[in-house]
Amino acid sequence: MSAGEEHLLSGIRVLDFTRALAGPTCTRMFAELGAEVIKIEAAPLGDLTRKISKLRADRSFYHIQHNLNKKSVCINLRDPKGMALVRELIPKCDVVVENFRPGVMADMSLDYDSLKQMKSDIILCSISALGQEGPLAKKPGYDYIAQAYSGVTSMIGHSDESPCIPLVGIGDVSTGVHGAFGIAAALLHRARTGRGQHLDISLLDCYYHNHEVNVHQHSGSGGKIMPTRGGRHVSYLCPAGVYRANGGDIMLMAFMHHWPDLCAAMDKNELLEKEGWLTDAERVVRQ
């Protein structure tokens, strides 16, 4: 995009009540695409992520990374004067994004019905660990909690050991992306109909989208297939995963129609006709 070209979301204003990672990822995507994002930080300390990853000049690189291009204002949300400022901002915004525990926005009289009284076509995106409704809704949670509930944790690590966790924010970031896409769709819907939306985006729901085959294998087989952890390897395809080699660890993804190519690269074409090596299922047993 050239310097003089208008950004995709120029003219869209987002009021951002989010902290940590999932919510800030959602609003950062809007900021990166040219929307005006106004981040509300709770006085007196501001966003708590300002206190971590202080690598240089006493500034949090975590906070910088996940809040790029945003404006910021520190407001005491427990003070009537602070809430008055918030209520002045809302009619001027297209979107409100929050990731408080479900019920907190209602406690501040900032739930969707209240927001609609201030701006009839407002779009509210509520991001939480376990959803806005249902038996788990009132429980607080983080990425790894939702990951465990979803069954994803059970698929990471070696089958004969306890599950592991990935040291990256898979759930938070993917939930932020889901939220941003939902808001973009709501903006399109509003342009067509004049109506706003309340979007319920949960880490738990988004984690289910990360199950490539586990859920449908188990449900489709009537429970006969029990997906298991495969350690360094994909549990149902081979070769697929990390393998030890003379020069160090390598990543191979040569299953199905790529198997002949790998055999040729290894100068092992005899494996193409060798019993026990013909299908992915046969090769999985041998890895």
Where are these predicted regions, by residue range?
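N-terminal helix-loop segment corresponding to the beta1-alpha1 unit
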Residues: 1-195
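Glycine-rich beta-alpha junction loops
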Residues: 44, 130-131, 203-208, 247-248, ...
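Short Pro/Gly-enriched beta-strand edge/turn motifs at strand-loop
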Residues: 46-48, 221-227
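Active-site-adjacent beta-strand anchor residues
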Residues: 76, 98, 201-204, 252-255
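Conserved Rossmann-fold dehydrogenase catalytic segment
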Residues: 132, 160-170, 191-207, 228-235, ...
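Oxidoreductase and adenylate-handling cofactor-binding alpha/beta cores
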Residues: 154, 176-197, 209-222, 263-273
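C-terminal substrate-binding/catalytic lobe of Rossmann-fold NAD(P)-dependent oxidoreductases
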Residues: 183, 234-237
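Aromatic-enriched alpha-helical interface/lid elements that frame and gate functional surfaces
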Residues: 238-287
